[in-house]
Amino acid sequence: IFVPSMFPTISVVDPDLMMRVPPKCTTYQGMDAFFHASESVINKNEHIVAEMFALKTIELIAKYLPVAYKDGSNKEARYYMAIANTLAGYYMNCTSAHTMEHVMGSYHEDLVHGAGLIMIAHAYYDFFAERKAAEEPMIKMAKAMGVENPTSGKDFIRALDTLLESIGCADLKMSEAGITREEMKLYPKRIHEVLGGDI
């Protein structure tokens, strides 16, 4: 549902208000912004301005989220994470990763959105990398994350795995959220029926 009233006329983005946000919340919200950006980059409806904002978002989050996770009072990290989250909000051309997570969340009310995205991230992007379906965009994202001379989508996935490890999220499992293989079989139909998206 997108209506004008969903979008604020003015937003106050103040890093000082974020200093006491707990580490887990910091990582989940930060990675939600990261995936909004990464999905904008690989989206088939790509836009040059969206890509510019998204790649900068990815660069900032890769650099500053681990710092904010380890030291929530680090003002520089909070400042640049606030910038990254703001940039990610300008263009949210989501792909099926967000669609799948929304369906996961509809079955599990306690599943934090960012955590759900992290759970599916490696397999999701590996699906594209194995098929070389988004090589150029994924190479761009790897560069944004600081990878030197990336040559394939796999380089982005390795950088993503390293980022998740650095923020204590490498071991999040769907099974720990109560998600079963049988339940997952229901997801494709649910995605089409409720959200109208592909997978």
Regions found by a protein language model. Give the residues of each.
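A glycine/threonine-rich phosphate-anchoring loop and its flanking beta-alpha core
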Residues: 1-46
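Glycine- and other small-residue-rich loops at beta-strand/loop junctions that grip anionic moieties
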Residues: 23, 50, 176
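Short runs of predominantly hydrophobic/aromatic residues within well-ordered alpha helices
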Residues: 27-30, 78, 117, 184
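Active-site segments that bind and position negatively charged phosphate/pyrophosphate groups
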Residues: 40-154, 158-159
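C-terminal charged capping/lid subdomain of soluble metabolic enzymes
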Residues: 140-199
